[in-house]
């Protein structure tokens, strides 16, 4: 029986088809990425630059596997009659030759194209909805990574055990597709990274910010730099303003720009205005939201409060990246600075691939993309790539994609019921019996 099973696996199952997701990530984009960035392979190699780009994206989908296993399972290397397998060192050298710029170009190209797909289905009164937030990732503790990225400093001159990468992402609220991202050294503040992202925010949009980004320079440049670009942010407890119109629950306020901010950015005015909307959070605490949506008839205060409550769902995007895709790994794979950047752009591209499939499946099922389980979708895509034995004929690709989306929406996320009993903290069970001895007086 075991011999029959081996024969079935070896001879009957087709090789995994990486072109399975080529309907979303066309090969033309891969060629353009390596051509525009000057990373195209001149010599005939088993791992040309185009295949290495696929490899970087695949490594993010299969974080629990080594680079050699991913190469063999997905058959990314070109066939060679003399050498059957590609060594780990050859794959590492191929990644070094590629660099990070082609993968970054591919992410930016694909992210903009995917965010424009079905955008009409997710508009809020004519506006696209985005959210901006920051996160950190650990890297291997190598001299190069520690020198370039730096690490967190604690009290008493204590430094974190691992270097860290700090980044800020611009994510679509309805679909959680990452539209744009900026990453770099840990010592650079999120405010500076956010300033780099603001010019890339599209017109006719509303961006929901974490209150840590409350800055006149960021918010004023967002509203003035494009056409019909708006912001929504929670005010800090020490934010001071003067009410000029309306009521304290919903009115127009005027705030003074600090002299330090005007010194850094002379274009800023002395005062800037926003609409202040009072809301009550889940803990029954009064909060104030600041927004540039000043039309009270078109944008009611209840709508604005509901939009800001959706911002918290973006936190799950980082959890999906770090826990589900990275498998709770302590650090990234790469040990070089260029490799770290390359891996991050590849991971974001892979994450968007999964999120795009979820969005397509949600449209077919007429439900919200956030109602579809990311973990289930991620596991299904992994399984499909390996064992579905999809033919390489593009004629059968649409039926395969339809089958995938039907599986994704078969079990939607359910709202958890409220707590039925009081919360209790229990002692952690010990592996061995412990006898406690009382101290003698």
Regions found by a protein language model. Give the residues of each.
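Single, function-defining residue in the core of a domain
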Residues: 1-69, 95-98, 105-109, 125-128, ...
